[in-house]
Structures are given as structure tokens and as C-alpha cells.
Amino acid sequence: MASLNENQKFWARVTELAQQSIGKQAYDFFIEPAQLMSVEQDTANILLDSGMKKDYWKKQSDLITTAGFEVFGRMIDYELYANDELTELELHRLNNQSSIEEQPRSTAKPASPLVSGLNEKYNFENFVQGPGNRWTLAAAIAVADKPGDTYNPLFIYGGAGLGKTHLMHAIGNQILTDNPTARIKYVSSENFVNDYVNATRKNQMENFENTYRNLDLLLLDDVQFFSDKEGTKNEFFNTFNALYDKGSQIVLTSDRIPQELNNLEDRLVSRFSWGLTTDITAPDYETRMAILLIKSESSRLEFPSETLSYIAGQIDSNVRELEGALNRVEFVARANGIAVVDIETASQALRSLKNATQQSLSNLTIKKIQDEVANYYHISFSDLVGPKRPKEIAFPRQIAMYLVRELLGTSLPAIGTAFGGRDHTTVMYAYKQISDKMKNDMDVQKDIDSIKRKF
């Protein structure tokens, strides 16, 4: 095994060569997050933050070869690992055999005795607050302040890309800052299952239980993907009970409320509801603008407010797609040598995204929207389009009219015809009612978002 000093020199040379040969954005995205875990038997073990980056790294053999000959005087091969592909046991093994120390960073947190999987870049300070996440953010801060005491478990639900995972990491990072010896683990439900299956296959259940049942904080992401296998569910049930009984904090996320998790048993679902269940909805216009302003500040390009306003008006689904849209606009601007990004450039960059959205809705019909709304509110199709006017029917009818107008752009008279021959002024009133509610009524925002996701 190479000495610690040699390993540090080797990795420093790899990164130096990379900085000299590739652009800053590529370096920051592909190279900077990578870690050298060890050099064993002429093989460098490199840990990436995502398996999606392996293809890029496979093309960087010249970096490894050159640095290997310069530092070790011999040929060095390399093996790639990825955080999102490794089981906890494998990652723990890699860390234990690691022979290179982390370089000190001003923002680094003291290491936890257990590999936590936390991402340092997610904290409460850089989480943008808005009407759709205000109460969930408050709950997350309360949990981080008094883990195991305030809301346990904390169950956060909402659509993809709205910030659920960000808040999970923020909770973990805050607790780790306050208590550097805290035993914290962030894991997806899929990786929990993988850890359990591997532990069972390798007869290492004692290690698995020690890993999970002695935590101070368990952050379990995307529980809707939990396996329906009996053994896995039993193990998680026992893990949940063990942690809860000893006062450890549990935070869970899902794309739906606990009662809609059909792959889980009632006994688990009921436990998810013991603490606080809270949701995150799509960001409103002001929140989207705030997110874009913050993100654009780190760009070398200038984004006038009217350009950011245009982008915010085009992307209203979730934060992830909003950030992706900004990145795409920046890429197009750089490719065309544009320093001050105008609306025309943004429109050009986002044209293909809008076309893709339109294509995904090309098979959507008025009838499909009506059926989905009727199903969502548990009323019949005939009541939805019929003459009945009680609130529990009139409100879903207004929602359906709003969605038809919003998603399909159907004319007001045509919508009226599809809803039992109603006058176009009735449709106009319904559309205005729901449009007004969408500005400040979180329940309506949540309903619209949930129904849209069905499409």
C-alpha cells in the first residue's frame, strides 16, 4: 500500500492535470467532488458522488497514468465506485481502507463515527422559503433543534424536485454541527433494501443491525419505493421501533401521504403518522424568482431581472426543473458568446423543453382530465358534468374546468359544452375562481399539483 504522503501527492497531481486540461465547469462537476479512497496493488480506488459520472471518468485514464508515473514511478490503474450505487457495508469498507485524509475546508463539519451519506451543500441557509414549503421548513428546523423530541417521525411528502431531500440533508447537517459525535445516516429506501439483502446473503445481519439500530438520526428518502418483500418490511419495522424507543429521530420522505403507500403494511403506515406529516408544493412565482436570483449570482454571466422573470414564468413544476432550465439557458448563452442573457436567448434555450412538455400532453383529452379529477375527489363522472351544485361537486367541477383550460387551451364555449352544456361565462367564472385560489390557497395548490402529476 502506498504511503499517505504519496497518495496525497498523487491525487493532487491528478486534480492539477485535470484543471489544466478541461474547462472549469467540467472540473467542478466531474473532478472536484471525486475522492481518492486508497491506492492498493497499483490500483487507485476512486469514489464518485454519482454513478452517472463513471463514463466521463473512464475517459480520463491519461490523468491517472501520468500522475502515477510522476509520483510512484510506475503504471497505476484505477477502479471507480459511486456513492449512489454502493451499499452501506461496501462504502464503510472503502472508508475503512482509505489511506488519504480529507483536506481541511473552512466549511467542513467534524466527521461522524458512522458514514452518514450527508451532502454538505444542503443546509437551511440556502433553502429558499416560499408559501409552498414554509411550514415544512419550520418543522425541519424544529426537528434539527430538538431531535427525537418535537416531531418524531417527521414525514415530508410532495412531488419530485421540490426540496424534500434538501431539507433532509439540512436537518442532518445542522444536527451534526450541533453534535459532532451524532450517529447519522441518510439512505434511500432502495439502498436500505440493498443493505438488508446483502447482509442476509453474506450472513452479516449483526453488522446491519448495529449500523441502523444505533443511529441518533435516520433519514430515509423515497419510502414509496420500499420493497414489498416481507423480510425487508419486517426488518424496517423492527428498526423503526428500536430507534423510536430509544428516542432517536426519524425523518421520512415520499411523493404521497402515508395512507396512500399501498406497498406498506398498516402497522408501518400508522407509525409514520405518529409525529408530523407535512407537505411541500410547487413554488409560486415569487419563490421561483428568488431561487433564480440566488442561482444566477454564482454565474459569470449577467441575468437581467426580466430574463429571470421570463424563465420563472416558463417553468412552474419544481425546483429541480427550474434550476435545469437556468443551466440550459446559461449553456446556450456561453455557446453563443453572450455575456448579458436576454429574453430571446432564454426563449431559444427553453424552446425544446416546451416542445417536450407539449409532446407529453399530446395524448391528454378533456375526458381524461374529467376522469382524473372525479377520481381524485371521489365523485362520479356524471355528477362532475351534471347539474348538481353542492360544494363537494361544484368545487371539483371548477378544478376540472381550470385544468382543461390551463393544459389544453380549449375555448370557453367548448369547455362549457363538455361540462353538460354550460354557458361560457360559467367556465370563465370557474377559471377565475381557481386562478385566484392558486395564488394563496395551499390546499388548492396541492390538489392541482397532485392531479397534474397523474398526467
From Swiss-Prot:
InterPro entries: AAA+_ATPase (IPR003593), Chromosome_initiator_DnaA (IPR001957), Chromosome_initiator_DnaA-like (IPR020591), Chromosome_initiator_DnaA_CS (IPR018312), DnaA_C (IPR013159), DnaA_dom (IPR013317), DnaA_N_sf (IPR038454), P-loop_NTPase (IPR027417). Disulfide bonds: none annotated. Keywords: ATP-binding, Cytoplasm, DNA replication, DNA-binding, Lipid-binding, Nucleotide-binding. GO terms for biological process: DNA replication initiation; regulation of DNA replication. Gene3D superfamilies: 1.10.1750.10, 1.10.8.60, 3.30.300.180, P-loop containing nucleotide triphosphate hydrolases. The keyword Cytoplasm applies. GO terms for cellular component: cytoplasm; plasma membrane. Residues 1-77 are annotated as: Domain I, interacts with DnaA modulators. GO terms for molecular function: ATP binding; ATP hydrolysis activity; DNA replication origin binding; lipid binding. It is found in: Cytoplasm. Residues 77-116 are annotated as: Domain II. Plays an essential role in the initiation and regulation of chromosomal replication. ATP-DnaA binds to the origin of replication (oriC) to initiate formation of the DNA replication initiation complex once per cell cycle. Binds the DnaA box (a 9 base pair repeat at the origin) and separates the double-stranded (ds)DNA. Forms a right-handed helical filament on oriC DNA; dsDNA binds to the exterior of the filament while single-stranded (ss)DNA is stabiized in the filament's interior. Belongs to the DnaA family. This is Chromosomal replication initiator protein DnaA. It comes from Lactococcus lactis subsp. lactis (strain IL1403).
